[in-house]
Amino acid sequence: FYCGLRNGYGYRDTVQDIQGVIHLEPEAAKEKLRFMLSAQVDHGGGLPLVKFTHDPGHEDTPEDESYVRETGHPAYRADDALWLFPTVYKYIAETGDTAFLDEVIPYANRDQGTVYGHLKRALDFSLNHLGPHGMPAGLHADWNDCLRLGAEGESSFVAFQFYYAFTILREFAAWKEDSPYLSWLEREQGRLRTLLNDFCWDGDRFIRGFTESGEVIGNHCAPEASLWLNPQSWAVISGLADEKQAGLAMDNVYHRLNTEYGAILMDPPYHAHAFDGALAVIYNAGVKENAGVFSQSQGWLILAEALLGHGERAFTYFKENAPSMQNDRAEIRKIEPYCYGQFTEGKASPHAGRSHVHWLTGTASTVMVGCVEGILGMRPDLGGIKIAPSIPKDWKALEIWKDFRGKKLHIRVENPSGKETGCAKLTVNGEELPGNYVPAEALTENTEIVLTM
């Protein structure tokens, strides 16, 4: 790595990295996913750092002084265990391995449970750490390690992850015919939707959250950090944002946060109005979490725009931050031309475009998901696969060869009318199907699929 090895596996980092290889190496992904599930504490939280000597069922935790002393991590982060939901879902949807839900895996410190049970406890961890508005508390950090929101401050980013977790767990509960739990999930998710719309929608953006003292982070009248990137993209990814909200929020991102190097994390940078938990103020304006272009966030932005059918924007965001697209300005970018950096200095920096922290980043995996699920539109679920490309208008055709549940798929997308998204006709082995969904039972050993946009 950029300055030596770490002393273990970061929980959120590793669980997210798995997502990018599921469609390529599903068995390797499954093995690593088992490992990370075994690093979940019995109350549902994830170990902030998983030791290289990890011994499932016998580990100490952040509640133990020995863990803090050895790892340097004194507390849980709000987002860690919530990354399990999309990763488990992507694995099962890609492979059809629904039996994985019933596989028994130990918890880090004691006890054991099925994968389905692990997910229930991950949801419980967030439910047991809610703030005054009923949103998940930010704890020691959410994805943004420079936001220290504590037990009373609340994170909208984590709230959108939480909302998405409900959606995924509802699908698993329905599959398992766990009717009482499914009914409870539906009620709780409806309550969460209401409070997120009531407390987090600010007319043309979603706020970033609340401080421990109850101040709003990221509303339109804030003198600094009035617009944040991740709440906008994750409101779309989670399915919480309606069409109008999504349009306004993502337009705000495009017109205000986007630069030729990608979208900055927030704007304006912190300088004179940072609250106590806004640790990003220690960085110069435009650097790292203080309004830099965080590379991993570009992957979520690609996916969000693609889910909305905005193929032009999705591909623009991909190109802006792609290492291979910047070889004509190596003297600006500085780092290697074949890898992502953690961040690129943003428009507030006198060195805009200079990138830093090579290799130590989850960007490659997240951008892979944004490209495969988003732009190419390969979106499997428990019953089959939806084909929903979101592409630039001038792409007249493309071909995809995909291994899927033991079958070989040859997919041709034709775009004679120059559209960004949509499906006018879908054929599978010459037979026309309604919509753009291919049920698993329609697949043969060698499947020919043609989608006309």
Set out the residue ranges of the language-model regions.
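Long, charged, mostly alpha-helical binding arms that flank functional sites
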Residues: 107-176, 180, 192-199, 203
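Short alpha-helical "patches" and their helix-cap loops
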Residues: 28-39, 99-109, 176-180, 245-257, ...
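Carbohydrate-binding/catalytic loop surfaces
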Residues: 1-8, 48-77, 108-110, 114, ...
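Conserved oxyanion/phosphate-binding beta-strand-loop segments in alpha/beta enzyme cores
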Residues: 1-4, 31-43, 258-273
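Aromatic-rich carbohydrate-recognition surfaces in CAZymes
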Residues: 9-14, 21-29, 33-133, 155-163, ...
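Low-complexity, Ser/Thr/Pro/Gly-enriched N-terminal "stalk/linker" regions
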Residues: 1-6, 31, 35, 125, ...
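Non-catalytic C-terminal accessory modules of carbohydrate-active enzymes
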Residues: 255-258, 271, 283-290, 303-453
